[in-house]
Amino acid sequence: MNIHRKPEWLRKKINPAAHGAMDELLGELRLHTVCREARCPNITECFRERQATFLILGAECTRLCSFCNVTKGEPLPPDPDEPARVAQAVVRLSLAHVVITSPTRDDLPDGGAGHYVATVATIGRVAPATVVELLIPDFLGSRAALADVVAAAPRIIGHNVETVPRLYAIRAGADYGRSLAVLRTLRELAPGCATKSGLMLGLGETEEEVLAVMADLRRVDCTYLSLGQYLAPSRFHHPVREFVLPETFDRLKELAEKMGFRHVESGPYVRSSYHAAGYGGGTRTDQPVASGCLSDQEGVSAQ
């Protein structure tokens, strides 16, 4: 297959005119979205349906992952008014499900965990019925930071392993074992909270390696999985090594479901936040849940 030319199934059109109102609102509230910063191919579809993944803690990342289009540089301090603006957007868009993510902020003592907590709390005050999903960085493996995020009681917490261990050089500053440990710790701190992870395919991995990662994710009791095609944002980013066939995504979805993932999104255009509301709202039906991630018996203050 010619990897320099996208196949027919990967030629989704982006139409900026279709989401002018969404652009206007985000500009008014001075909010970033990963949809724009990462040049997501689903932006027209999601913005037209008034769905967005909000990017808090600025638009500059402290790591240099070779696959990512988020700006690298020296970030600004967290904006204390940002949580209120995100909450205002949730209300004005009448969102039933909102996804919050951020660049990696290794420059902050808590990695930005406190800003996540403030954002979840503010949304909870003004839109208590909205399901809040977080897609977090690894916080350098800090259990204290993870405990703070869990205590804020989002319904779903995601952390992407992104690729197979052999290719982790593309994730500057990241560690495969640490990412698995993050997901394991989230489950230990809040057994009733759904966890989620995702992989990009087409980076040069083998199917056997993908299946091994899926097995690792199940060993840390990861609830949800997303599998999508990697598309290089520019010629300066890590190149696409393969355009994975749609039927391969279908087969991997079937295998993942047999492994025990509660819900799987798998397809060329799938991204970790794509069709986020379809994952079931985040409550694990096999665990008692009183509020978000925390059940009546749980607490993290002593961790």
UniProtKB/Swiss-Prot annotation:
Its EC number is 2.8.1.8. Pfam families: Radical_SAM (PF04055). It is an enzyme of class 2 (transferase). Gene3D superfamilies: Aldolase class I. Pathway: Protein modification; protein lipoylation via endogenous pathway; protein N(6)-(lipoyl)lysine from octanoyl-[acyl-carrier-protein]: step 2/2. The keyword Repeat does not apply. It comes from the Bacteria. [4Fe-4S] cluster 1 binds at residues 35, 40, 46, 273. It catalyses: [[Fe-S] cluster scaffold protein carrying a second [4Fe-4S](2+) cluster] + N(6)-octanoyl-L-lysyl-[protein] + 2 oxidized [2Fe-2S]-[ferredoxin] + 2 S-adenosyl-L-methionine + 4 H(+) = [[Fe-S] cluster scaffold protein] + N(6)-[(R)-dihydrolipoyl]-L-lysyl-[protein] + 4 Fe(3+) + 2 hydrogen sulfide + 2 5'-deoxyadenosine + 2 L-methionine + 2 reduced [2Fe-2S]-[ferredoxin]. Keywords: 4Fe-4S, Cytoplasm, Iron, Iron-sulfur, Metal-binding, S-adenosyl-L-methionine, Transferase. InterPro entries: Aldolase_TIM, Elp3/MiaA/NifB-like_rSAM, Lipoyl_synth, rSAM. Binds 2 [4Fe-4S] clusters per subunit. One cluster is coordinated with 3 cysteines and an exchangeable S-adenosyl-L-methionine. It is found in: Cytoplasm. Coiled coil: none annotated. Its main location: cytoplasm. [4Fe-4S] cluster 2 binds at residues 61, 65, 68. The keyword Transferase applies. Residues 47-262 form the Radical SAM core domain. Its cofactor is [4Fe-4S] cluster. One of its GO terms (cellular component) is cytoplasm. GO terms for molecular function: 4 iron, 4 sulfur cluster binding; lipoate synthase activity; metal ion binding. PANTHER family: LIPOYL SYNTHASE, LIPOYL SYNTHASE, MITOCHONDRIAL. Belongs to the radical SAM superfamily. Lipoyl synthase family. This is Lipoyl synthase. The gene is lipA.
